[in-house]
């Protein structure tokens, strides 16, 4: 939908779309900007330019237009106080990790809190009406601007003011009146300073008019009136109209404080710490001039570097001032911003990694580390985390609860970054030789090798960071796209009655509603369909084998083998009870292991994915490192302790909003639940999840859980494979048998080694006797030595390194026509040793090199003595045969 076309139509009828009661009562005048043509509403009859192009743009820097001064946290208290006083419910922020939307990794706007996906539609579910929320939002498209422009953040607090007029809320008149009074009454801004600009919003098939409100060129908020759906000209009014007013809390603080940048009034005491580190006074005329120029020009140019050059020129900044003041200050702001974002994200369960949304988090931490390194700063990240959390904890108490988790994860990630620097340096040198990389190549270097463009710039591999780098990277890793499932001709069929959610009979009768090749649809079924990582039930229908069961929307489809019944026929159905029981135990075990992992490892543990079949199951969890044997044992012990305590496994249904408010968003371990009524499976307070799977009645029904294997399957994800119930007992039995077998093998091996050592000791004593026999031409084959005249070969396991050296050396020392070659095992290596007398005609070096090469190794020496070896034990027989033929002929 073309926003310009919508705006053109709406602006042609301002009384219908924009002219609210406040404008009439206060005497606002509608004007068209003399420069860009945009329509705006103002009380200043002399104003001819819109806020973007006005002469007063960013004039509040150094001279705030408010009668009161509030920093970041104080500004929220003022906003909250105003809206609560005006009959709004203040709602706590939602997580920045968007668990309730499968198309987003992070919460990008306050209205996202209340959006739920139902089929192909996005619906709104508000916990109160009207409400206000201090929603922390994460956006990564403008990372290159953070710290530089004075107003760009990677995370920011969107003040969400939301109302549904048709359900007891209010509409345009009240909304604009409230926002105007918030500015003028609560913050003491002169009413002549407030300007409203006409705009529109469109997305997700819906659209509506909006009014952006500005003070001295700074956009403080945007009131969106989501009212229509469909295409322009053919649109209809939504059943549920919604007010979506989003305002920037950081900007409210900035307008009241008038600091050179928004960063100066939003990070609290962390700024004092950082400014003290670099010895710069942030409240200086130079900084005010520079950042005012940046703010004025940033929206008029695509190239940030060009904006900076222009700001330097207009503010009269020297190269020395740029180097000693501006650049370090930009670094300080970047550190403060990125660290705050990481604190929120990790608190809410995200991990820095090289997959999904974790890309952006790792990128920010590496930017922090690179900035600290570049500026040669002595900073303790833990101290900075404490400063952030202590400043924010009154507004966001959850940050205080997770501060230690944040510290440990960032410490681990920073250590990995340091370890990777040697590799990064080698890669950077190659990049430098190759020439300036493209944006796509820079993205590849980061994704494949973890090399940030800041690092490449620091080591002079690139001269500038492309302004589009972070926006392109963000586009790749901001949302999760789901694959479409195959469709079947199921039109007109009713929803399948799900008996497995009722009495769950293992035998039942049902009517065949439709036959599609080897698949049938019944009017009701007890066969659980594949879903939520749980494999389907098997069994029989009308005597035919059920080999698969899938769910398509609300219709369950059964795939049969050997034939199908006729449409309209009533058939007897039987579920494989043993298979169902095993899968059910594995599913509840998955919940138990998830809870156990979280208790043992940390609060950042979330289910990444899961699979439950009848003979095995697996759970992939979000974790930063491979698991140690001790951690695995602790998780297994904790899981079996939950089984021993025989907790009841309760299933209850809640309205989705009620479930979220009651239990939080940790219920979405298995992903988004696209239904209004949510099925909650709870094991006391240990694990509470929204889940559609089959479960045991009590944890004791599982009897036993055994973790069979763990591995780190990708960065930030660890897989635990396990069995439960009868399969666990069978596994335990097999492990005991295997342990017994290994113990017996160890004893046998020990005895064999002991026997070999005894034989080797005896062999050493026999050296003089064997020498006499060989020199006398006697047969020594019974002693494991083959001879041809005075030429000898052995591959007997009774002879060790000592024997070969002494026997061979003494043999050729006594007879110059003699030669000796031995092949023997020495640990994991097979060795060859060759001695040859001067008149033997044997070249020791040639034999040793040849045999060693067969064994995949190398040999060395001269014609009289040589040795070598290799580790390819599969070639042992070939090596022995070749050595024997080379010396004996």
Curated annotation (Swiss-Prot):
What is catalysed by this protein?
tRNA(Ala) + L-alanine + ATP = L-alanyl-tRNA(Ala) + AMP + diphosphate
Q: Which prosthetic group or cofactor does it need?
A: Zn(2+)
What is the uppermost EC class here? ligase
Q: Does the keyword Ligase apply?
A: yes
Q: How is the cofactor bound?
A: Binds 1 zinc ion per subunit.
Q: GO CC terms on record?
A: cytoplasm
Specify where the region named Disordered lies, as residue ranges.
734-760, 866-889
Q: Where in the cell is it found?
A: Cytoplasm
SUPFAM superfamilies linked to this entry: Class II aaRS and biotin synthetases, Putative anticodon-binding domain of alanyl-tRNA synthetase (AlaRS), ThrRS/AlaRS common domain, Translation proteins
User: Which PROSITE patterns does UniProt cross-reference here?
Assistant: AA_TRNA_LIGASE_II_ALA
Which annotated residues bind Zn(2+)? 587, 591, 691, 695
GO molecular function annotation? alanine-tRNA ligase activity; aminoacyl-tRNA deacylase activity; ATP binding; tRNA binding; zinc ion binding
Q: Which family does it belong to?
A: Belongs to the class-II aminoacyl-tRNA synthetase family.
Outline what the protein does: Catalyzes the attachment of alanine to tRNA(Ala) in a two-step reaction: alanine is first activated by ATP to form Ala-AMP and then transferred to the acceptor end of tRNA(Ala). Also edits incorrectly charged Ser-tRNA(Ala) and Gly-tRNA(Ala) via its editing domain.
Name this protein carries in UniProt: Alanine--tRNA ligase
Q: What is the lineage of its organism?
A: Archaea, Nitrososphaerota, Nitrososphaeria, Nitrosopumilales, Nitrosopumilaceae
Please name the gene that encodes this protein. Answer: alaS
């Amino acid at each position: 939908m073309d926003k310009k076309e919508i705006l053109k139509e709406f602006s042609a009828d301002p009384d219908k779309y924009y002219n609210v009661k406040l404008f009439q009562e206060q005497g606002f005048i509608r004007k068209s900007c003399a420069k860009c043509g945009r329509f705006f509403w103002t009380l200043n009859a002399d104003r001819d330019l819109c806020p973007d192009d006005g002469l007063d743009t960013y004039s509040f820097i150094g001279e705030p237009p408010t009668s009161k001064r509030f920093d970041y946290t104080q500004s929220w208290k003022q906003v909250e106080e105003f809206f609560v006083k005006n009959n709004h419910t203040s709602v706590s922020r939602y997580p920045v990790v968007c668990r309730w939307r499968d198309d987003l990794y992070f919460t990008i706007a306050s209205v996202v809190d209340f959006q739920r996906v139902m089929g192909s539609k996005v619906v709104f579910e508000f916990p109160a009406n009207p409400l206000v929320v201090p929603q922390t939002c994460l956006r990564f498209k403008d990372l290159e601007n953070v710290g530089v422009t004075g107003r760009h953040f990677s995370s920011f607090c969107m003040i969400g003011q939301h109302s549904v007029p048709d359900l007891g809320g209010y509409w345009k008149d009240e909304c604009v009146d409230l926002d105007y009074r918030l500015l003028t009454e609560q913050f003491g801004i002169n009413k002549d300073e407030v300007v409203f600009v006409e705009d529109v919003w469109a997305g997700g098939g819906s659209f509506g008019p909006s009014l952006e409100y500005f003070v001295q060129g700074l956009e403080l908020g945007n009131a969106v009136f989501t009212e229509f759906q469909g295409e322009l000209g053919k649109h209809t009014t939504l059943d549920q109209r919604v007010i979506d007013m989003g305002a920037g809390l950081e900007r409210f603080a900035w307008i009241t404080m008038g600091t050179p940048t928004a960063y100066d009034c939003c990070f609290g005491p962390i700024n004092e710490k950082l400014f003290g580190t670099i010895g710069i006074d942030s409240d200086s005329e130079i900084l005010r001039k520079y950042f005012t120029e940046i703010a004025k020009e940033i929206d008029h140019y695509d190239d940030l570097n060009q904006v900076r050059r222009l700001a330097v020129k207009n503010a009269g900044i020297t190269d020395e001032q740029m180097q000693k003041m501006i650049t370090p200050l930009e670094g300080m702001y970047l550190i403060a911003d990125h660290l705050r974002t990481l604190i929120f994200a990790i608190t809410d369960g995200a991990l820095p990694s090289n997959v999904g949304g974790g890309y952006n988090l790792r990128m920010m931490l590496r930017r922090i580390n690179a900035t600290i390194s570049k500026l040669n700063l002595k900073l303790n990240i833990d101290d900075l985390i404490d400063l952030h959390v202590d400043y924010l904890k009154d507004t966001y108490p959850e940050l205080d609860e997770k501060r230690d988790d944040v510290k440990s994860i960032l410490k681990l990630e920073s250590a990995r970054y340091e370890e990777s620097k040697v590799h990064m340096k080698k890669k950077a040198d190659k990049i430098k030789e190759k020439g300036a990389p493209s944006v796509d190549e820079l993205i590849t270097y980061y994704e494949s090798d973890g090399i940030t463009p800041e690092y490449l710039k620091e080591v002079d591999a690139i001269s500038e960071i492309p302004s589009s780098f972070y926006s392109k990277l963000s586009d790749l890793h901001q949302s999760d796209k789901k694959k479409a499932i195959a469709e079947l001709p199921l039109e007109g069929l009713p929803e399948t009655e799900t008996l497995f959610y009722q009495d769950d009979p293992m035998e039942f009768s049902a009517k065949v509603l439709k036959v599609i090749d080897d698949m049938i649809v019944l009017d009701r079924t007890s066969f659980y369909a594949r879903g939520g990582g749980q494999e389907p039930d098997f069994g029989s229908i009308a005597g035919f084998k059920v080999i698969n069961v899938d769910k398509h929307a609300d219709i369950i489809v059964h795939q049969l083998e050997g034939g199908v019944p006729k449409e309209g026929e009533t058939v007897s159905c039987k579920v494989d009870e043993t298979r169902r029981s095993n899968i059910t135990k594995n599913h509840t075990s998955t919940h138990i292991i998830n809870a156990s992992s979280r208790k043992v490892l940390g609060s950042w543990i979330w289910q990444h994915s899961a699979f439950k079949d009848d003979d095995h199951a697996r759970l992939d969890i979000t974790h930063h490192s491979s698991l140690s044997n001790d951690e695995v044992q602790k998780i297994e012990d904790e899981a079996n302790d939950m089984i021993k305590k025989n907790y009841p496994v309760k299933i209850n249904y809640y309205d989705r909003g009620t479930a979220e408010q009651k239990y939080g968003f940790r219920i979405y371990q298995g992903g988004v639940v696209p239904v209004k009524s949510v099925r909650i499976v709870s094991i006391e307070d240990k694990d509470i999840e929204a889940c559609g799977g089959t479960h045991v009645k009590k944890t004791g029904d599982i009897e036993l859980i055994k973790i069979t294997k763990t591995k780190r399957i990708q960065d930030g994800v660890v897989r635990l494979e396990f069995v439960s119930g009868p399969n666990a007992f069978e596994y335990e039995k097999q492990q005991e048998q295997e342990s017994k077998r290994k113990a017996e093998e160890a004893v046998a091996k020990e005895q064999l080694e002991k026997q070999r050592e005894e034989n080797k000791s005896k062999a050493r004593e026999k050296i003089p006797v064997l020498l006499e026999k060989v020199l006398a031409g006697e047969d020594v084959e019974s002693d494991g030595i083959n001879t041809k005249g005075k030429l000898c070969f052995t591959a007997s396991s009774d002879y060790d390194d000592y024997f070969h050296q002494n026997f061979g050396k003494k043999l050729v020392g006594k007879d110059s026509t003699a030669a000796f070659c031995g092949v023997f095992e020495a640990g994991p290596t097979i060795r060859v040793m060759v001695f040859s007398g001067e008149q033997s005609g044997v070249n020791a070096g040639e034999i040793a090199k040849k045999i060693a090469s067969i064994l995949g190794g190398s040999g060395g020496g001269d014609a009289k003595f040589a040795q070598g070896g290799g580790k390819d034990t599969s070639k042992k027989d070939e090596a022995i045969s070749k050595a024997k033929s080379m010396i004996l002929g």
